């Protein structure tokens, strides 16, 4: 560059002006996602130290009761998180590094770190680094180069820091209560165990999820009705018995602190038939016959309506989770089972049937507190 250009464009002054106007931000600093001054005040001055009430989670009650200690960060992050598994597969990671039982935990962690490098903008990228910062005090971005150091440091802390046990984490982060996801036939033994621990820092309460009782089209429906019958201590020979058994188990859940139900539905259900008609459908299925789509929806409408009325009477919130196509990969379902990263979003119409279902409850003033997910 010529001397006259240097005089015309004094780099030192340009850099000073630029630095003043555009200060380099720390990677995911304390104001991450807090874009305005108002947001920063609301979070830091009010929300930050509030107790956590997680009313919809998939934590395992036994692991909570036994105060599980993770041996590696791979165990904590990749032992069962099918959201991470899904994005690893999208990155072309071999299945052995995703769910392999005999794969070295460090190799799995490196595969996750390499995947994360390509996932910037995905919530998993944010969650991963927030967890590294808040639980381990690690502020370095996770990638292939940093994986070994982060792996070793996190594992050291898991081994030495009691605050990183399940109970320790719940205490450290001021978890007031969590609502686990539980089947009506569950005996809630681990919830009882936790409730009996005088020093336990949080409430662990069941949430009522009767998907198997509504899944009349499923191959294991008949076996499940037998299981529900045993749990309720009553014979189930009719649709009225199904409802009675479910309500009986709901009351047991309520006695254990339950405040919410949870239902996974592909779309809304709104085929209203009489009890006699639905009883014929139930009997037909229990005898091993196949049902039409209309019969399946009529059964689900009847049972869900009865449960919604029971929720309303008991002040139980009803969570309805729509629009997922489950278990799309039959080969991997056979190998790994459900909830392993092979669900997808559905494109069926929802609004009309959901409106009709809720309106039917509204006529009699029996709409429970309702939370909708897609």
Language-model features, listed with the residues they occupy:
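Intrinsically disordered, low-complexity segments enriched in serine/proline and basic residues
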Residues: 1-10
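Short, Lys/Arg-enriched N-terminal segments with co-localized hydrophobic residues
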Residues: 11-23
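Alpha-helical and His/Cys-centered functional microenvironments
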Residues: 14, 60-62, 325
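Metal-cofactor-binding active-site regions of metalloenzymes
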Residues: 23-314, 366-374
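Long, well-ordered mid-to-C-terminal structural blocks that present hydrophobic/aromatic surfaces
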Residues: 290-374
């Amino acid at each position: 560059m010529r001397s006259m250009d240097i005089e015309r464009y004094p780099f030192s002054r340009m850099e000073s002006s630029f630095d003043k106007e555009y200060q380099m931000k720390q990677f995911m600093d304390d104001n991450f996602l807090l874009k305005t001054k108002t947001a920063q005040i609301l979070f830091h001055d009010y929300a930050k130290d509030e107790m956590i009430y997680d009313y919809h989670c998939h934590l395992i009650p036994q692991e909570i009761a036994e105060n599980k200690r993770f041996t590696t960060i791979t165990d904590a992050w990749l032992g069962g998180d099918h959201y991470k598994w899904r994005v690893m597969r999208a990155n072309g990671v071999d299945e052995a590094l995703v769910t392999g039982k005999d794969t070295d935990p460090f190799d799995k962690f490196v595969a996750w770190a390499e995947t994360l490098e390509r996932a910037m903008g995905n919530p998993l990228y944010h969650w991963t680094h927030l967890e590294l910062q808040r639980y381990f005090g690690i502020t370095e971005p996770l990638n292939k180069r940093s994986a070994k150091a982060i792996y070793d440091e996190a594992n050291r802390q898991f081994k030495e820091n009691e605050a990183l046990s399940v109970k320790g984490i719940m205490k450290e982060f001021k978890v007031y209560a969590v609502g686990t996801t539980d089947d009506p036939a569950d005996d809630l033994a681990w919830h009882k165990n936790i409730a009996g621990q005088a020093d336990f820092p949080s409430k662990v309460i069941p949430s009522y999820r009767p998907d198997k009782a509504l899944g009349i089209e499923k191959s294991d429906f008949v076996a499940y009705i037998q299981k529900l019958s045993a749990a309720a201590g009553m014979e189930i020979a009719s649709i009225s018995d199904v409802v009675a058994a479910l309500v009986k188990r709901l009351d047991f859940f309520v006695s254990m602190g339950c405040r919410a139900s949870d239902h996974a539905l592909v779309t809304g259900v709104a085929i209203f038939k009489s009890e006699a008609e639905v009883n014929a459908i139930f009997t037909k299925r229990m005898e091993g016959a196949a049902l039409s789509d209309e019969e399946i929806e009529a059964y689900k409408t009847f049972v869900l309506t009865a449960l919604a009325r029971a929720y309303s009477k008991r002040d139980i919130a009803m969570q309805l989770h729509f629009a997922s196509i489950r278990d799309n990969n039959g080969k991997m379902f056979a190998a790994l089972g459900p909830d392993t990263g092979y669900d997808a979003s559905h494109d069926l119409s929802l609004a009309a049937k959901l409106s009709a279902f809720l309106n039917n409850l509204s006529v009699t003033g029996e709409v429970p507190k309702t939370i909708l997910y897609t």
